[in-house]
Amino acid sequence: MIVHPSRENFSSAVNKGSDFRLKGEPLKHVLLVDDDVAMRHLIIEYLTIHAFKVTAVADSTQFTRVLSSATVDVVVVDLNLGREDGLEIVRNLAAKSDIPIIIISGDRLEETDKVVALELGASDFIAKPFSIREFLARIRVALRVRPNVVRSKDRRSFCFTDWTLNLRQRRLMSEAGGEVKLTAGEFNLLLAFLEKPRDVLSREQLLIASRVRDEEVYDRSIDVLILRLRRKLEADPSSPQLIKTARGAGYFFDADVQVSHGGTMAA
């Protein structure tokens, strides 16, 4: 496992690059999972120069150890990890965390793999060989997007059918089945629907609302998020009763929604 930079050598490294942090803001922590030693060192060196803390690991065991002991802001996963499948790391992390996940890969960026990874919870893709400047830009986008999904001061709760979405706690609860975990994109997309029930929302509107920013899969990204939400909300995702398609226009949420503002309920 490689951790970089240390507090002692960081100041000399940052002078070579650009630091966009606010005064007093801690270093953003990137956790990289890649068994390619040369790639790990390249990413560590470049991100260090640009004011990031980077922890690089080679397998899921080291990844889990770091994740359990440190605060991580972005995860970068190579799909090809020798004897391991990077998609399993994506699947396990997305099921329990909203940390943005960027996938890097050389020979597994077919459309099917992209769709599968999006369904599992990945946020972005970049193919090897890639521009290190583009890689840095994608990390910065992921960091700009993440604060928009945190609504800790919003005390509203949305109730529909037997579901309740609590914004402050970021929890989706079912009377029948308990809590259902949502990724950041799923949470934002569901909130967009609940704020405008029965209004048809275009893909562009949903893209903005859910903060999905992967140009390579622009149209498919919303469709994949819709599919994931249907699987979690609908009794029969193939015949949805809540999230419905408006042919040629977008999607709409077909249910009565009640909103509670910290105890006061409104339709």
Swiss-Prot record:
GO molecular function annotations of the record: phosphorelay response regulator activity; transcription cis-regulatory region binding
Residue numbers carrying 4-aspartylphosphate: 78
Any GO CC annotation of this UniProt entry: cytosol
DNA-binding positions: 155-255
Main location: cytoplasm
Top-rank taxon: Bacteria
PTM comment text: Phosphorylated by wide host range (WHR) VirA protein.
Response regulatory domain span: 29-143
SUPFAM superfamilies (UniProt xref): C-terminal effector domain of the bipartite response regulators, CheY-like
GO biological process: regulation of DNA-templated transcription
Subcellular location, record wording: Cytoplasm
Matches recorded under InterPro entries: CheY-like_superfamily, OmpR/PhoB-type_DNA-bd, Sig_transdc_resp-reg_C-effctor, Sig_transdc_resp-reg_receiver, WalR-like, WH-like_DNA-bd_sf
Pfam families referenced in this protein's UniProt entry, alphabetically: Response_reg, Trans_reg_C
UniProt entry keywords in alphabetical sequence: Activator, Crown gall tumor, Cytoplasm, DNA-binding, Phosphoprotein, Plasmid, Transcription, Transcription regulation, Two-component regulatory system
Stored CDD domains: REC_OmpR_VirG (cd17594), trans_reg_C (cd00383)
Entry function: VirG is required for the positive regulation of at least two vir loci encoded by the Ti plasmid of A.tumefaciens.
Protein name per Swiss-Prot or TrEMBL: Regulatory protein VirG
Organism of origin: Agrobacterium tumefaciens (strain 15955)
Taxonomy of the source species: Bacteria, Pseudomonadati, Pseudomonadota, Alphaproteobacteria, Hyphomicrobiales
